[in-house]
UniProtKB/Swiss-Prot annotation:
Gene designation: psaC
A GO molecular function held by the record: oxidoreductase activity
Organism: Synechococcus sp. (strain JA-3-3Ab)
Name of the protein this chain belongs to: Photosystem I iron-sulfur center
Native organism taxonomy: Bacteria, Bacillati, Cyanobacteriota, Cyanophyceae, Synechococcales
Primary localisation category: membrane
EC number: 1.97.1.12
Chemical reaction(s) catalysed: reduced [plastocyanin] + hnu + oxidized [2Fe-2S]-[ferredoxin] = oxidized [plastocyanin] + reduced [2Fe-2S]-[ferredoxin]
Complex and partners: The cyanobacterial PSI reaction center is composed of one copy each of PsaA,B,C,D,E,F,I,J,K,L,M and X, and forms trimeric complexes.
Keywords annotated in UniProt: 4Fe-4S, Electron transport, Iron, Iron-sulfur, Membrane, Metal-binding, Oxidoreductase, Photosynthesis, Photosystem I, Repeat, Thylakoid, Transport
Residues binding [4Fe-4S] cluster 2: 21, 49, 52, 55
Amino acid sequence: MAHTVKIYDTCIGCTQCVRACPTDVLEMVPWKGNNKAGMIAAAPRTEDCVGCKRCETACPTDFLSIRVYLGPETTRSMGLAY
């Protein structure tokens, strides 16, 4: 099931989220933003996202530069729907 994966410009380009993803949803791409790495995470294969949120857990920034937004079917099955 596909989930929405958002990467914010607070990404420091550390690659922790890319390495943590079990389904290779993420990859690093060149970026001319404000990080020393010159790279930022990108999510070109969100259709493979299983919603495990390992990428969020691996993110070392205080801002959670990467967020996975679970679809309604997943939140319902987890008992999280309102």
